[in-house]
């Protein structure tokens, strides 16, 4: 029994989000939420909301016991990149890439 939640086009770079995702991969769901709650990184707040959504999906759609769930899969993929322009000296310009992420969390019963 698995439940999935996806956050698309989150305004954080995949590199920064993967640092937090690696910490909670494979943990029991409640422990993962608790760990993310006390992290001060921006990615932790976003990933916590996705994990809580996946837990709610498992509970409401499949009647799973919350205490039995663990984070089976957590993926952070690259989303669309916003291209911005920053003026520089002597009439030049530089591109600024504002990266986005797609965060996918799958929770399931611990085996």
Curated annotation (Swiss-Prot):
UniProt GO molecular function: rRNA binding; structural constituent of ribosome
Any one GO biological process: translation
Keyword vocabulary terms for this entry: Ribonucleoprotein, Ribosomal protein, RNA-binding, rRNA-binding
Pfam families for the chain: Ribosomal_L22
One GO CC term on file: cytosolic large ribosomal subunit
Cysteine-cysteine disulfides: none
Assembly notes: Part of the 50S ribosomal subunit.
PANTHER family linked to this entry: CHLOROPLAST 50S RIBOSOMAL PROTEIN L22-RELATED, LARGE RIBOSOMAL SUBUNIT PROTEIN UL22M
Recorded family membership: Belongs to the universal ribosomal protein uL22 family.
Its biological purpose: This protein binds specifically to 23S rRNA; its binding is stimulated by other ribosomal proteins, e.g. L4, L17, and L20. It is important during the early stages of 50S assembly. It makes multiple contacts with different domains of the 23S rRNA in the assembled 50S subunit and ribosome. The globular domain of the protein is located near the polypeptide exit tunnel on the outside of the subunit, while an extended beta-hairpin is found that lines the wall of the exit tunnel in the center of the 70S ribosome.
Protein's name in the database: Large ribosomal subunit protein uL22
Gene that encodes it: rplV
